[in-house]
């Protein structure tokens, strides 16, 4: 086992603080509408330019192991805030830096670190309550656009597109962000349920120009096993022909004779038909087939339930106003399912989302909710160069996360003002001793740090701005760094999601509290230069001629 280097007391804390400051100083230049970019070196390709706090934090590794430990702990603040709220990583980093810096000063002055931490926790809980009380629901898509714009560093176009997408797919809809090949940023919305399985044979195509199969007022047969022969289905197919409606078969697979028979019937014009594979795999496939059944008012023909193809009747088939099938995707629009049943299914999937511990499962379950309840929108981000597209995509991702958070827990005044106003709730709060009171004072001072940083990035004196806002009785009064004006932040459209601000403070206080109470640090000793590698052979001389 390698020898360890151990640091204690002031030496350990100073090294740790240096690491915290190095990382936080690199991240905080991105804060606010006039925040700057950070350029990140890539091992291959062009450097990446970003204003996303967590992307900057993730790139930083320091040479000194003790400093690096401090930096990594603050990186954890940014990562946790990003995971929980999806935005607010820079705010969280600035708060953590301020709490750690002030806290370590007090520890150096002889105060008890544990009592300081208790005071910090006490103050944080009080401020979080105040933030929750200040939050108000998002009224309309204009406010959604404002939240998106602020999070995208003042680019109104991004905010507007996210608001449009959310309006179209609803709060339950899924919005994904992709890179676009062109210059423009555009939004595509898919209404109805779409899944990534296309037609099994190009002979099913009805629109030769677009190479799509389009079925209007269509019947849908859902079968969870493979279809290799149509013999058991003949009575059903005869009824379908009499009804003169098109039929879509969704099954695990349709192969061999069954597929050939369907194609021949389609070409002869006797039967308007198409077949696609069922989406998903294993248990997820069963669940998705059941979703389609509920959406279209049909039943899944499943051997688990003792159903056979021979006994399928017309009332077991689902129906939909329109179905469009390309070679890669199937879209079912306006299924005939009962609204109450669809809502019950959505509630059931939501309960599974609450219980699951896997991020992958959660994402897939949320997609299923969106397909049943809302729809799916794709924002394709464009730009002149690849570097610009990646930088804009970072901002669109942040803005999207911020708008989702705003819909969940409401909005508060932005620009760091809410934290300063919430800090007024600490007046009169006292701990059980003077050291805890010092912890409360640390949080009160730290709450001004994001506001000061936003002002300083805009080239204005942060202390003056913080003083003006502190003195104001109006809770919405703040400083708009974009226009450098004072006034009502709601009327300026400078608003933040309550969830983002709350999460940033909770995560910053949690990890800063751990750093303040650190008394010793242990790291591997660096290997001495020129030391022989362990286990090497003493002499390999005289073997130079061997190839």
Curated annotation (Swiss-Prot):
Region Disordered: start-end pairs: 528-547
Known catalytic reactions: ATP + H2O + a folded polypeptide = ADP + phosphate + an unfolded polypeptide
One cellular component term from this protein's GO annotations in UniProt: cytoplasm
Gene3D superfamilies xrefs: GroEL (3.50.7.10), GroEL-like equatorial domain (1.10.560.10), TCP-1-like chaperonin intermediate domain (3.30.260.10)
Signal peptide: none
Positions of ATP binding: 30-33, 51, 87-91, 415, 496
Domain of life: Bacteria
Entry EC number(s): 5.6.1.7
UniProt-recorded Gene Ontology molecular function terms: ATP binding; ATP-dependent protein folding chaperone; isomerase activity; unfolded protein binding
Record's subunit section: Forms a cylinder of 14 subunits composed of two heptameric rings stacked back-to-back. Interacts with the co-chaperonin GroES.
Protein name per its UniProtKB record: Chaperonin GroEL
Species in which this protein is naturally found: Ruegeria sp. (strain TM1040)
